[in-house]
Each structure stands twice: as structure tokens, then as C-alpha cells.
Amino acid sequence: LKVTEKNCEELAEKVEADWEVNRHLVDGDIVIFNRQPSLHRMSIMAHEVVVMPYKTFRLNTVVCPPYNADFDGDEMNMHALQNEEARAEARVLMRVQEQILSPRFGGNIIGAIQDHISGTYLLTHSNPEFSETQALDLLRATRVDELPEADGVDDDGREFWTGRTLFSELLPDDLDLSFTSSAGDSVVIEDGQLIEGTIDEDAVGAFGGEVVDTLTKEYGETRARVFINEIASLAMRAIMNFGFSIGIDDESIPPEAE
């Protein structure tokens, strides 16, 4: 029998012991997701449901590396857990945030990828300046609802905030870290503030991003999950702000390389 708004009260009066009642998934339900072939532990992870329109599975792109998912026709499988014991086990052992670190090499397998990396690079490499409206727009998908003190005033007398300052808003206040970026410059973070350097793959990327790896090991999986979500959102806002495109010439091998 299908339960509808018209017959739900009548069926509620008729329901008896041993009836099996099924329902649709709702926001917050825990399910298991996987992509074949499931070759390692992180090939099968637990996710919380967000019900959306249409008939395709959608997932946060930062979890693509452990699934080896690349959107070229991959088939994903979802399994709805049927009892409380299974749901509890999934929440404790199989949630995505519990799989950030790879058991194979000990570093983070989950982190920023592709356009996220381009976005953080554009945001921090030349340390561009943003107006109050622009800064709030970049941070609107994060927990930050109030800007820090401005970095300066432009020629028109308007306050501005730099890209490194906006990135720093996502870091713990007591984080101290230094390393060399993929771009070859020194990255220095003191008391949760990015002092110098470019944030790229070696900083926040999957498979060994220094910031993600440090947050996971020293601040815990929950704090790392929040950072990964927020840096992905900030990076996408940044790349949309600057614009980013490639052409066929970008695929050509330069003469010196030949």
C-alpha cells in the first residue's frame, strides 16, 4: 500500500504488529556510498542524505579522490541502512570525516582538487585586494559572518581586505605552520594568519596538503572537515570572481620543452 496524505490516517488506524512500513529518505539519514571496484577502505563511505530534485546522485567533489570518481560515466551505488545498529556503525566508523587520512600513506586523501586549487592560488599568490562587498561575497558560504580588521585603505578611501586575510579566516587562531608550496615559495602561517606564500595543492590539496594534514592530526577530523568544506566553497567563489579559462594553445608543448 502506498501511504498518501489522503489515506495516512485510515492506515494508521489499521496498522498492526508485524507490518513492514517503508518510507522515503529524508535529510539527515545515513547511507553508504560506493563506486566499483571497491579496492580500499575509503571506497565505501557513509554520507548524510540531502534530498534534492531530479534522479541523479550528487556528492561533494572533495570526496572524489577516495572513490576515484571523475564524472566520465562512473556508476555510484547507494545503500540505505535498515536498522539502528547498522546506522550507528556507519556514523561512528564510516563517515567521510573518519576517512580523511589514508591508511596506506598516513596523509590526507581528502582535500581540495582541481578548480579548488586554482581558486586558492588566485586568491593568495599575488594577494589581491577586495572591497567589503567582495570579501563578504567570497566568505558567504563559510561560517564567517563578520570581517576582521581591514588590511588598509585604497586611493578612494575605501577599506580593503587581501586574499590571504580572507583565507586566514578559515584557520584555527593558534595554528603555526611553515612549508614550501608547489609554486616554490615559502608559506608561513603564524597564529592562524597567512603571513606569506601561495596556497596551492601542497597546502590544501588531496594526497598531502600540509594544512589539511595538520588540521586532521592536531585538531581532529571534525575541524578538518569544516575547513575542507569551507576552503572548497571559498575557492569556488574566488575562481568565479577572477574568471578562469583555457584554450587549445595551453595544450601545446613550448619549444624549449621539445
Please place each PLM-identified region on the residue numbering.
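Feature marking long nucleic-acid-engaging regions of large polymerase/nuclease enzymes
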Residues: L1, R41, A46-E258
